[in-house]
Amino acid sequence: MELKNLAQTLLPRLVEIRRHLHAHPELSGQEYQTAAYVAGVLSSCGLHVEEAIGKTGVVGQLSGKGDDPRLLAIRTDMDALPIEEMVSLPFASRHPGVMHACGHDIHTTLGLGTAMVLSQMGHRLPGDVRFLFQPAEEIAQGASWMIQDGAMKGVSHILGVHVFPSIPAQQVGIRYGALTAAADDLEIFIQGESGHGARPHEAIDAIWIAAQVITALQQAISRTQNPLRPMVLSLGQISGGRAPNVIADQVRMAGTVRSLHPETHAQLPQWIEGIVANVCQTYGAKYEVNYRRGVPSVQNDAQLNKLLENAVREAWGESALQIIPEPSLGAEDFALYLEHAPGAMFRLGTGFGDRQMNHPLHHPRFEADEAAILTGVVTLSYAAWQYWQNIAI
């Protein structure tokens, strides 16, 4: 109850912080003012602050007074999106074409709020808490930058949070197992031979072969992949040809590949190349497949999930807890931290309960109910407070 009362007392300041961040969004890798603002708040709370971690990231370490060697990290992200805000708010974006349309202003506020609460309890914390304020989540590079600069050194476990407008504010969603998908980039080049549109038998039609490749890939997903292990392959770009009466000799396709299970993720490059090779060899074309690993799936740790569940129940009661039944095929570079320490990410509801529709993330009319701020800060604070008593080494 003491943590909750502290957070409640700080709420006006937290709303002020959130509105400042929302009005001053910065794109991925350009979070200079945001980082300086975050560092200033952390320093005022007495944390040890390191700036320029992961380029524009910030790390704040709160020292407990106990001797427990386990180090808990709490990660939030800071970057905005290249979207023109269409919500008429007194604190709407002041930067044309840039908007906090994914709630990272809320996330940053939650990290700062939790640091503010726990800093007032630091003399009673059994161990240390490290706060990671990450840049460039939207381009899936910030986590790797932070890790390369040592942000995860010594970390035992890590917690993360993401807002979710389809969950009502003042509710928390917990997902056991896979929360989000692995996301990779795919690029395919088809090389045929040009010819007159009236004489296709004298050419190798790269556009037609590309169509066969697309069809073969989609058919193979439904016939050769385990339907209980979801994956999605979406080709969102295709280009080729120079004139309507000339058979194209080159086609480029590009898209995204999403999967939930590590075993499926591991075999995708070879599986895709095999299908492309078979089609192209059948029709005499050459090909090139460029498969670029993005981020793996977020696989939540059961111990950390139970810690979050207990925190929600103790702070807010059973009615505030949702167990999420299905994962998302969206991606989150929080997964990269989980390659270095077990962890869990939860969904924080930001939906307005009195609205028929809450606009989704990445929408120019996305809006978050600020009641979520108290819920998120208290949940993270309770989880951190209980961490050393409930999580095994």
Swiss-Prot record:
InterPro entries: Amidohydrolase (IPR017439), Bact_exopeptidase_dim_dom (IPR036264), Peptidase_M20 (IPR002933), Peptidase_M20_dimer (IPR011650). Keywords: Hydrolase. SUPFAM superfamilies: Bacterial exopeptidase dimerisation domain (SSF55031), Zn-dependent exopeptidases (SSF53187). GO terms for molecular function: hydrolase activity. Pfam families: M20_dimer (PF07687), Peptidase_M20 (PF01546). It comes from the Bacteria. Gene3D superfamilies: 3.30.70.360, Zn peptidases. Its EC number is 3.-.-.-. Belongs to the peptidase M20 family. This is Probable hydrolase sll0100.
